[in-house]
């Protein structure tokens, strides 16, 4: 789903006002659901979620938090719903055998770093994580899902995008009214700079919540000066295009697709033909690459990024406290 343009406009936009009553009902139901008590996993649970629908950087944040957990001497495992995959789980993700159509794209990325479990039933997924030897569970998404109790929930916010018009879906991008989400959050991770993210950070600080600034950092690449046709099926493809431009790539065309888009053969053929016509290389994201057939992916460049925190030690201290570590 591509977010409608009016989500980024003010709350007085005619479409937002027209959908306001429906958003109020949806938001009230979502908020009531969030307040339900969850089952205990038997080990600490850290949740990387977001206030809004769409991409904010939860998966890079989950990877970075899991790395900090491992540095503290714990054994993390990832737990995901597996959005876009057909398997209900619980199942351990095996990148050598599973496809994105089965388990979703993000779990395939997570499973490269630590055991990853896909489960629509989060408590059952947590039990499988424990059986795999995990003593800390890192949830990729699930802030609004109450079925599993969390020891620390960090809301990931895209700095440039912020929270849009601040209204609940479908009038805006919020998954529930913001005032009802704050009590479930223990801190923020704000990725990138922007007025929207700054406003959310100030609201968090007024509530005494820690705010962790972060940025996406490119892994080593040799894209400078290369003609690139960029394609991506992610929440905010413009972030990907901007990162490519920062790498010095010459972007001769872009092809945005919906988030989690399953690429069809005719679409891939059209991409290959467009790249040939433009005398360009195809470039995409890691998340898109795992959704491509292996033979096609072999001819596509992948831009790899990681999340770097402005003050990793501050986040490490907060995680240590959530784990009950000395």
From Swiss-Prot:
Transmembrane segments: none annotated. ATP binds at residues 52-59. Keywords: ATP-binding, Kinase, Lipid A biosynthesis, Lipid biosynthesis, Lipid metabolism, Nucleotide-binding, Transferase. One of its GO terms (biological process) is lipid A biosynthetic process. Coiled coil: none annotated. It catalyses: a lipid A disaccharide + ATP = a lipid IVA + ADP + H(+). GO terms for molecular function: ATP binding; tetraacyldisaccharide 4'-kinase activity. This is Tetraacyldisaccharide 4'-kinase. It comes from Methylobacterium radiotolerans (strain ATCC 27329 / DSM 1819 / JCM 2831 / NBRC 15690 / NCIMB 10815 / 0-1).
